[in-house]
């Protein structure tokens, strides 16, 4: 999911405005550090999650000078981690550094940095290196951050750790060395499981699935997915990624119904800002729906920001809808590079059978009787013996129930039966039932996504039990008093 996370920017020309912008960035970073510090002491993970979101908003504005000033403020100058992180930052000119030093010198630095702040510094520098396209330095920085994470076992670090895991994998993917870290990711997933770090398990499971699918290792990905522990999702983004990878695995395994549900749910749960991810989900969902014999609505291809990316799939859908094998072949050749880069080439090869079935269904509806020679011509079969192939295709379609017809082998005809009233069958009921089930599932997911006060039901129960206990104590005291009166 590189499209929706990686942020590209143009290199800003050097100017004298750095002296006015750097202090503001440094000021924001200080506020974020204070938020992380408060969350660490209070053990409130939501504060640290908010700090990460604020950091993503500042991502485009990060400069080497402001990062250097922040490292001097948070870390002890001359310490091992300070020296290591400072070595990754490029040296700015003296004027910029003087401004940052003057700005940071007015603030009292943190004497004993928390592990959360140290990990946050790793995250900041790593994001900066990736945005500057310094991937080799980013790989070294990410490896150092992962080594530091192994020595920290605090639940307040989990949010920062999950981000570091993602960028750690992204660095190696951008350099084409994704296979090198598969063993390390498995080890990290094992550590996260032992530490009951559920957010880390979610993130690492998705990274491992992405790693396997990148090299088309679908069987290994399914074995890992089926054996990995599952629990309630902590991150909506990670759950969307998981559903997308699950949909891809199900598609390759020919489980198209489950794949369609997973892919559509992933596209629906994805953030609106993640346009690239939603485009990928829609591409796979369109192919899966075509393989199921469905024709996606035109509105699917007209979604805002997706028209250009989904154009090849729109033309492909049109060829499948018409049942024109020659048009389908031309579209597949025209956009072969696009389908190859999307990883859907093998699925489009499977669609050829659906195109033939659709064309045959149209012929069956249009003609009450037609010769197999004409069937072969209309389907545009390019085999050495098209009539024999047409006879075989018609026979299989009749056997599978795709068309309601009979085959006259003696005369070489396909005789279609009269089409019945579809409203007298169970198909409308099945269609309505599927739509109602979809709405009910969406309602249940919305209810489960609501946030409730922690332990609210337990507090209510404890209050009721307390009243019962007090009532029982009063009755017991009254009973004892009556017994004492009887003794007298």
Swiss-Prot record:
Residues 1-20, 452-488 are annotated as: Disordered. Keywords: Nucleus, Proteasome. One of its GO terms (biological process) is ubiquitin-dependent protein catabolic process. It is found in: Nucleus. InterPro entries: 26S_Psome_reg_C, CSN3, PCI_dom, WH_DNA-bd_sf. One of its GO terms (cellular component) is nucleus. Residues 456-481 have a biased composition (Basic and acidic residues). It comes from the Eukaryota. Pfam families: PCI, Rpn3_C. GO terms for molecular function: enzyme regulator activity. Residues 240-421 form the PCI domain. Acts as a regulatory subunit of the 26 proteasome which is involved in the ATP-dependent degradation of ubiquitinated proteins. Belongs to the proteasome subunit S3 family. The 26S proteasome is composed of a core protease, known as the 20S proteasome, capped at one or both ends by the 19S regulatory complex (RC). The RC is composed of at least 18 different subunits in two subcomplexes, the base and the lid, which form the portions proximal and distal to the 20S proteolytic core, respectively. This is Probable 26S proteasome non-ATPase regulatory subunit 3. It comes from Nicotiana tabacum (Common tobacco).
């Amino acid at each position: 999911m590189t499209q929706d996370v990686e942020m590209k920017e143009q290199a800003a020309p050097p100017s004298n405005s750095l002296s006015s912008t750097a202090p503001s960035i440094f000021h924001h970073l200080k506020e974020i550090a204070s938020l992380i510090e408060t969350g660490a002491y209070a053990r409130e993970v939501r504060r640290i999650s908010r700090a990460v979101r604020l950091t993503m908003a500042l991502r485009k504005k990060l400069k080497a000078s402001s990062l250097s000033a922040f490292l001097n403020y948070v870390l002890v100058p001359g310490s091992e981690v300070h020296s290591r992180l400072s070595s990754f930052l490029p040296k700015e000119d003296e004027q910029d550094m003087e401004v940052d030093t003057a700005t940071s010198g007015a603030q009292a630095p943190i004497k004993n940095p928390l592990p959360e702040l140290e990990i946050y510094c790793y995250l900041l520098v790593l994001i900066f290196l990736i945005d500057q396209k310094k991937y080799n330095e980013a790989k070294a920085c990410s490896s150092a951050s992962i080594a530091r994470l192994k020595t920290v076992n605090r639940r307040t670090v989990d949010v920062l750790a999950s981000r570091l895991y993602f960028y750690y994998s992204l660095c190696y993917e951008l350099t084409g060395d994704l296979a090198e870290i598969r063993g390390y990711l498995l080890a990290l997933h094992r550590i996260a499981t032992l530490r009951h770090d559920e957010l880390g398990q979610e993130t690492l499971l998705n990274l491992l699935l992405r790693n396997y699918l990148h090299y088309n290792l679908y069987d290994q990905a399914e074995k890992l997915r089926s054996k990995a522990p599952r629990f309630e999702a902590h991150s909506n983004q990670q759950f969307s990624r998981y559903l997308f990878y699950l949909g891809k695995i199900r598609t390759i395994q020919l489980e198209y119904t489950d794949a369609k549900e997973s892919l559509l749910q992933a596209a629906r749960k994805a953030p609106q800002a993640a346009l690239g991810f939603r485009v990928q989900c829609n591409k796979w969902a369109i192919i899966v729906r075509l393989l199921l014999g469905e024709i996606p609505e035109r509105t699917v291809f007209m979604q805002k920001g997706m028209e250009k990316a989904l154009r090849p799939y729109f033309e492909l859908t049109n060829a499948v809808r018409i049942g024109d094998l020659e048009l389908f072949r031309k579209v597949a050749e025209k956009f072969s590079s696009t389908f190859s880069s999307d990883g859907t080439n093998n699925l489009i090869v499977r669609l050829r059978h659906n195109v033939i079935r659709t064309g045959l269904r149209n012929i069956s509806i249009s003609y009450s009787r037609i010769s197999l020679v004409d069937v072969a011509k209309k389907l545009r079969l390019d085999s050495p013996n098209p009539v024999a192939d047409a006879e075989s295709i018609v026979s299989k379609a009749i056997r599978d129930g795709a068309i309601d017809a009979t085959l006259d082998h003696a005369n070489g005809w396909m005789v279609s039966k009269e089409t019945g009233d579809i409203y007298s069958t169970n198909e409308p009921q099945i269609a309505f039932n599927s739509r109602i089930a979809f709405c009910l599932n969406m309602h249940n997911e919305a209810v489960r996504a609501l946030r409730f006060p922690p332990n609210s039901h337990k507090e209510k129960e404890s209050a009721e039990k307390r009243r019962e206990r007090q009532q029982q104590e009063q009755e017991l005291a009254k009973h004892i008093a009556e017994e004492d009166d009887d003794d007298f």
